[in-house]
């Protein structure tokens, strides 16, 4: 995590930079430091639901500022104990094959190459914890699985995932086979990494060994669908910030206050370092399908919650369709195409992505970048500053149901020549923040 500092508004005056002066911005030390990520659900992305239908969208995604495209699982889906008519993407029948719904391996290679031509990265979802019940491993290598008292395959304990069989990582042959499958997509298709499903359910020592092996082949980007410093120590570049998601949902419901967010950030800072990237999001495939759209969960606070997620230290995620204001729960086991319309929110998300790309104070990996929480007299204002020697970004978020007027913004450490980032204007004499919205100022 970035350095976390609490400062008081009274007397907290900072020197400002003239708006006519160019801000010196260096290149990040690694491409991931100012990267952004976009989750793509191949089945629901287009009417055909295949790889070829993604190609016309790539230049649009590039223009939005997307750096990493994450494809949900691309493998054949098991038929035994299948849920719904199409099944769960996370019930993998063969780790080295392509789901025929999506196309073939040649189509996939064209997609990978096209993404690389636009200087973007592609990672694919990987389900290492379990397979479908009709995966060939279940008959050829039954000892690779967790068996019940009757010597039968079983789903992961404590779940209703009756369509998948739990794997047993005490078996070294399984470990070798899984790493071999991970290497396959890097060696044969030149993908750039993996998003690893329920990563905390797979032993850390396996991940450490596997990721070390993968990185001998390529500098892959590894995302864990879990949180914990142990996963970063095992080699993962980024982890889900589920804790933040839960706190933000509770704040939206009125069950928690902004002090809960303060507490969470303090805990985060005590656990993670500047190279441990945390992924922030307002929605993803799980939240959308099972818990409700971002509009359902956040209600009136949708915009302020979005601004918060996109300005936190870490990396922001967009789930496909958000740029069109997606407000329906996509069915998980059936075809349910996204209604794209006119991409009504695309400019909004493009600005938020570009904020992170172009401002070095928003980058990861720099130990000299500081996150300062700004104290103020406004109970429902969550204010903070991210800065380094070249760049300063101040974020003011109004979680109140009424607009907020700030007459003396210099008490918040904002300079008179600061730029209102979203509106592209010099800061006015009096700041007016609409209800459940925010302001971002660049020095």
Regions found by a protein language model. Name each.
Residues 14-15:
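C-terminal motif of bacterial Sec signal peptides marking the signal peptidase cleavage site
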């Amino acid at each position: 995590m970035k350095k976390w500092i609490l400062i008081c508004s009274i007397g907290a005056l900072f020197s400002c930079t003239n708006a006519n002066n160019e801000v010196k911005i260096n290149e990040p030390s690694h491409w991931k430091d100012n990267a952004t990520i976009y989750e793509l659900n191949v089945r629901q992305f287009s009417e055909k639901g295949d790889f070829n239908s993604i190609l016309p969208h790539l230049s649009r995604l590039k223009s939005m500022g997307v750096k990493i495209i994450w494809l949900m699982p691309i493998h054949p889906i098991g038929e035994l104990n299948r849920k719904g008519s199409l099944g769960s993407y996370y019930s993998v029948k063969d780790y080295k094959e392509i789901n025929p719904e999506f196309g073939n391996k040649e189509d996939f290679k064209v997609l990978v190459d096209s993404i690389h031509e636009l200087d973007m990265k592609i990672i694919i979802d990987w389900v290492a914890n379990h397979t479908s019940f009709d995966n060939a491993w279940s008959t050829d290598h039954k000892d690779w699985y967790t068996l019940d008292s009757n010597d039968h395959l079983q789903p992961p304990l404590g779940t209703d995932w009756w369509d998948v069989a739990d794997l047993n990582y005490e078996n070294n042959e399984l470990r070798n086979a899984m790493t071999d499958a991970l290497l396959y997509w890097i060696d044969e298709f030149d993908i750039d990494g993996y998003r690893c499903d329920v990563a905390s359910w797979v032993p850390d020592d396996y991940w450490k060994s596997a990721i070390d092996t993968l990185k001998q082949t390529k500098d892959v980007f590894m995302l864990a669908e879990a949180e914990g410093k142990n996963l970063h120590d095992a080699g993962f570049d980024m982890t889900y910030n589920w804790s933040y998601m839960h706190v933000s949902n509770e704040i939206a419901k009125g069950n928690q206050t902004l002090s809960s967010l303060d507490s969470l950030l303090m805990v985060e800072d005590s656990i993670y370092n500047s190279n441990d990237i945390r992924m922030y999001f307002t929605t993803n495939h799980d939240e959308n399908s099972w818990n409700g759209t971002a509009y359902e969960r956040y209600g009136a606070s949708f915009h302020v919650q979005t601004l918060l997620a996109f300005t936190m230290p870490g990396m922001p995620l967009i789930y496909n369709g958000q740029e069109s204001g997606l407000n329906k729960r996509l069915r998980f086991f059936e075809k349910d195409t996204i209604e794209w319309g006119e991409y009504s929110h695309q400019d909004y998300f493009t600005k938020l992505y570009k904020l992170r790309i172009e401002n070095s104070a928003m980058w990861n990996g720099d130990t000299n970048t500081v996150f300062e929480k700004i104290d103020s007299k406004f109970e429902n204002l969550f204010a903070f500053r991210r800065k380094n020697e070249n760049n300063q970004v101040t974020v003011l978020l109004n979680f109140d149901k009424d607009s907020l007027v700030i007459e003396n913004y210099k008490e918040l450490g904002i300079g008179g020549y600061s730029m209102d980032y979203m509106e592209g204007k010099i800061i006015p004499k009096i700041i007016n923040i609409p209800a459940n919205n925010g302001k971002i100022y660049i020095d």
